[in-house]
Amino acid sequence: MSDVTVANYHAFPDARGHFGRYGGRFVAETLIGPLQELAQAYDAARHDPDFIAAYNKDLKDYVGRPSPIYHAERLSRKVGGAQILLKREDLNHTGAHKINNTIGQALLAARMGKTRIIAETGAGQHGVASATVAARLGLECVVYMGATDIERQQINVYRMKLLGATVVPVTSGSATLKDALNEAMRDWVTHVGHTFYIIGTVAGPDPYPRMVRDFNAIVGREARAQMIEDYGRLPDAMTACVGGGSNAIGLFHAFLNDASVRIYGAEAAGDGIATGRHAASIVAGRPGVLHGNRTYVVCDDDGQILETHSVSAGLDYPGVGPEHAFLADSGRVQYVGIRDEEALAAFHLLAHTEGILAALESSHAVAHAMTLARDLPKDALVLCNLSGRGDKDVHTIAAREGVRV
């Protein structure tokens, strides 16, 4: 990691969509025009009081915001050390943080006169959230999903279909999130005249990383105000899972300039970094270009993207949002790898102590929150983003543990 001195983390990206040496637009010439059109439309919308009012109204009345911060008292006692607090994004409509972003992008699509939206999805939560807002706004919806992920997330596939979306299986490559994103990009190039591509994470070419961040930043703004109101201070540490990194940057962004708050991103270490079967782009990757932006990627010595592994479909991605790459280089956020078995243990412990089934993605963050808590005094506060609920993962966990359901 290089040494980067930053006075104000909220000053990024720059006018060209760069977070330091990361980000940008590394795309075919055919996409430059559509991306410029999208950037102009988004910049106009985010300064339009009517658009912001409509977005905030939907967050309140449709999504059900604000989401609460819950003190996991029994989990904290079981783990020992600091108090673990959960930002309950799992309580949002559709069961995850993804709806914060899809509401914003769908409203922008309608504002631009687009009649069709497309999306990629891994765990299925972004696909469900995209299908949900498409149904609400009367837009056609097509979701690209890797065939491997379809097998392990059949409940969410059926939810998308119930909502009126067409789910397109992607069989190329490893048939996971990376490949679904590739196919969605190809669709967008072909049908850009009437199609809006709702990217589900803070990756992709500019303006997507900043746009998805901005629509998810409500998580951190709420959490900051809630911490001050309920506890009279900011947390000592916070953590969130990181695949592409949208839930994490949504929580982190409001706290980046608060030097007293230690921030951690929990990547998927899969079977262990040393095995090569992981999806830890920052912990075990290197800078490269993927899906239109420069960032950290999981690749070989020649720069070729490698297949990744995680028990969690939503973290099974060989890249990470460029802002996370920048935050890693600056040292503001520390990124750690959480193995499958650690995430599964955290899933079970949270269920047994608090009656909460967390998504496998979120369980990576819960696992690291537990590690942080053990090394801190009892009066310290650790905030963990519970980015989604785990109903979708019950069959995956049961199959892994030899239970027939």
UniProtKB/Swiss-Prot annotation:
Names of required cofactors: pyridoxal 5'-phosphate
Upper lineage ranks?
Bacteria, Pseudomonadati, Pseudomonadota, Gammaproteobacteria, Lysobacterales
The Gene Ontology CC terms held by the record are: cytoplasm
Q: Which residues carry this modification: N6-(pyridoxal phosphate)lysine?
A: 98
Which pathway?
Amino-acid biosynthesis; L-tryptophan biosynthesis; L-tryptophan from chorismate: step 5/5
**EC id:** 4.2.1.20
One Pfam family this sequence matches: PALP
For this UniProt record, the keywords arranged alphabetically read as follows: Amino-acid biosynthesis, Aromatic amino acid biosynthesis, Lyase, Pyridoxal phosphate, Tryptophan biosynthesis
Give the protein's recorded name: Tryptophan synthase beta chain
Q: Which GO terms describe its molecular function?
A: tryptophan synthase activity
Q: Give the range the annotation lists for the signal sequence.
A: none
> Which SUPFAM superfamilies does the annotation name?
Tryptophan synthase beta subunit-like PLP-dependent enzymes (SSF53686)
What do we know about how this protein assembles, alone or with others?
Tetramer of two alpha and two beta chains.
Record PANTHER family: TRYPTOPHAN SYNTHASE, TRYPTOPHAN SYNTHASE-RELATED
* Keyword presence, Amino-acid biosynthesis: yes
- Tell me which family the UniProt entry assigns to this protein: Belongs to the TrpB family.
Q: Which domain of life is it from?
A: Bacteria
Its recorded reaction(s) are: (1S,2R)-1-C-(indol-3-yl)glycerol 3-phosphate + L-serine = D-glyceraldehyde 3-phosphate + L-tryptophan + H2O
What does this protein's UniProt record list under function? Answer: The beta subunit is responsible for the synthesis of L-tryptophan from indole and L-serine.
